[in-house]
Amino acid sequence: EGRSGIENDSVYLCSPQVAAAAALKGEIVDPRDLAEELGDLEAPGVELPEKYDGSKADIIEPDEAVDDDLIKGPNIGDVPLKDPLGADIGGETLLKMEDNITTDHIIPATSDILKYRSNIEKLSEFTLSRVDDTFAERAKASDHGILVAGENYGQGSSREHAAMCPMHLGVEAVLAQSFARIHKANLYNFGLLPLTIDQETYDRIEQGDHVEVVDDVAEAVRSGAEEFTVRVNDDWEATAAFDASEREREILAAGGKLTLTKQQYEEDSGGAAPADD
């Protein structure tokens, strides 16, 4: 959505056959009709060698590793890391969204924005701007927050920025009626708690409500809990489902995959942490 550069335009995916037929005809046509028109065509042949040369004759060996500083351009920032999961998660419902929120809604994929993809500090300013252009500023002011969504939250291309930027802005959990599979995995990878809520809970929660996960979150995640109790405005409670593999629980409890990898590196190297850059 919006990838063509026009706000209200749509871009559709098609099969390679449809794309090839359109390229040959200059318009969208049924590739089966084009096949009948062109008749039998032989695909170009490619001869593969019986054996590939496995030598390193054409490879220039690198110099020995040195402790030089990594030189980065002005638009390349550090990758944000999240602290390990704590006992408490709660905050303002920063945004309540409808069904089928895509990763393009979460982080627009237009050229004027994607140039900041290596600068999370800047890129996060555009988070959910296609839904509410005040979101980023409100999230920064709130420090900790919750997102609420309908069905199929996070559908579309599997860009990690769609989880990383909300995390950078202080979002701690997403309550949705269902999640797109890959985006849900990315939420785990960046330490955000995905909880599945029913229709009644979705209908009752309003933007601006304070939502708190009642349980000791870190302990519940590690111990295999499959549901959490959420309290809204200290007024009413609901049950939210939590479905995660053992590996996903380990990643989430650590604060995300990057934080977990750093922890494991420190353990394996006797406490020497890699440079942040």
Could you tell me what each predicted segment is?
Residues E1-D277:
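Fe-S-dependent hydro-lyases/dehydratases of central metabolism
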